[in-house]
A protein has these predicted regions:
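Short beta-strand elements bearing conserved aromatic residues within extracellular beta-rich modules
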Residues: 373-375
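Conserved catalytic neighborhood of penicillin-recognizing serine enzymes
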Residues: 38-95, 110, 140, 152-182
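Short beta-strand segments within Ig-like beta-sandwich modules, predominantly Fibronectin type-III
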Residues: 385-392
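Conserved aromatic anchor
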Residues: 350-367
Length: 423
């Protein structure tokens, strides 16, 4: 908008809008990895808490608390309580230092800043520059549009080199980036799959701000209205920050299509840019290692071969901080074999009565899943054939012929476990 007396530029001049959750990597998780050397698998708990010194309860966008999770999941699904907890661990001084390294001025940081709902307001240009440092191995370049001026004589020129500095360690840049890749993935609860560009390695973060209860009444807003929607994403070549909203705060975003607009616009722009200058993939630096850990362990433990797939994850660590101890929580599971197996021949009916017992029936076993029994039969030493799968402990086998040799085998089954057979 270049009309009017002040030539207002939303990209550069708009510093009155809150950034929402796009601030979380900059003020919470980036500093936690940089200064505390947190892993992407660091355990956190999404639970009901209040702001320090207040009875104001902190909520999540869906009104739920999801319990124990990794900080990776907490960030890519944009949970609020883990963000506030992370800010508490980092502390306002280190958060301020990290922001300052990215060209963002701040003072008097409070816990509401952890969610991008405080006084740290950032223009889209500054937001793009800050995120670019994550994709640039931790190096921050001040935003600029002019690199060289040639004077009227056509010979004299002056070049401008932007300020460039190391804002964070390469491990911080990569580990934050790796989490933010999940934001644009198809993972469950990922917030920006609409920003993904096929074949392009992209990382990014969404952000949404809220109206206060007084504003809902003042502006007569309908439920679900929001004032701002952000998406900031980057590759190894480009960083783009897109804000969506209206110049007047009283005019609200009221539909999901409006909320998603920054994502779809990002995708359109990045698709075009990448066709002309393709971006390479983000490269893991030597300062970062990966390990398979037990989700929710504290301190983190390495997963062993018996750890269920649902309870382990491969996460990133600053080299030298990865766990060395394996979990002892998960051990080989054995299922008791059936006992007291008997078979009797009923010549008149030409059938066999086969029965057995199992520890799951008297409570002496440790089985938690229901137990069923697979019954197999061999005739005269031939191949075994499964003749029944049952939860009972007795079956009748018809068509038994006198003079033949029958061998019955019973195997207990519970979930993925199979016992040794009883014959």
């Amino acid at each position: 908008n270049y009309t009017g007396e002040f030539n207002y530029n939303f990209a550069y001049d708009m510093t009155t809008r809150q950034p929402g959750s796009t601030l979380k990597p900059l003020i919470d998780y980036g500093p936690a990895i940089e200064y505390l050397k947190w892993s992407t698998g660091q355990t956190t708990v999404d639970e009901k808490i209040t702001y320090s010194g207040s009875d104001q309860v902190i909520g999540n966008w869906d009104g739920r608390y999801l319990g124990t999770m990794t900080v990776r999941e907490a960030l890519y699904t944009s949970r609020n309580i883990p963000a506030v907890k992370t800010f508490r661990e980092v502390g306002p001084d280190r958060a301020k230092e990290f922001l300052g390294n990215l060209g963002i001025e701040s003072s008097g940081l409070t816990e509401s800043e952890a969610l991008g709902g405080g006084r740290v307001n950032i223009s889209p240009v500054q937001m793009a520059a800050s995120y670019a440092a994550f994709g640039n191995n931790g190096t921050y370049n001040s935003p600029h549009a002019i690199t060289k001026i040639v004077f009227r004589d056509g010979k004299t020129s002056k070049s401008f080199k932007p300020e460039s500095k190391k804002a964070m360690s390469d491990y911080t840049a990569y580990m934050v980036t790796d989490i933010l890749r999940d934001v644009v993935s198809n993972k469950r609860n990922a917030s920006a799959p609409r920003a993904a560009v096929a074949g392009v390695d992209i990382a990014g973060k969404t952000g949404t701000t809220n109206y206060g209860s007084d504003e809902f009444e003042k502006f007569n807003l309908k439920s679900g209205s929001v004032p701002d929607s952000w998406f900031t994403g980057y590759t190894t070549n480009y960083s783009i920050a897109i804000w969506g909203g209206y110049s007047q705060r009283k005019d609200a975003i009221t539909t999901w299509e409006e909320r998603w607009l920054p994502q779809t616009l990002f995708k359109s722009i990045m698709t075009e840019l990448n066709q002309h200058n393709p971006s390479s993939s983000f490269k893991q630096p030597s300062s970062v290692v990966s390990a398979s850990i037990v989700v929710g362990s504290n301190p983190l433990k390495l997963a062993n071969e018996y750890t269920p797939a649902t309870q382990k994850a491969t996460e990133l660590f600053v080299k030298g901080t990865e766990p060395t101890e394996y979990t002892e929580e998960f051990v080989p599971q054995n299922l008791d074999s059936p006992t007291s197996l008997q078979a009797s021949y009923n010549e008149a009916a030409q059938l066999a009565d086969v029965s057995w017992s199992h520890s799951s029936l008297d409570g002496s076993g440790e089985d938690t899943d229901p137990v069923t029994f697979e019954v197999s039969m061999k005739v005269d030493g031939g191949p075994a054939t499964v003749i029944s799968t049952t939860s009972a402990t007795a079956i009748q086998v018809p068509n038994i012929e006198r003079g033949k040799e029958y061998t019955f085998t019973v195997t207990a089954i519970s979930g993925d476990l199979r016992s040794d057979p009883a014959s």
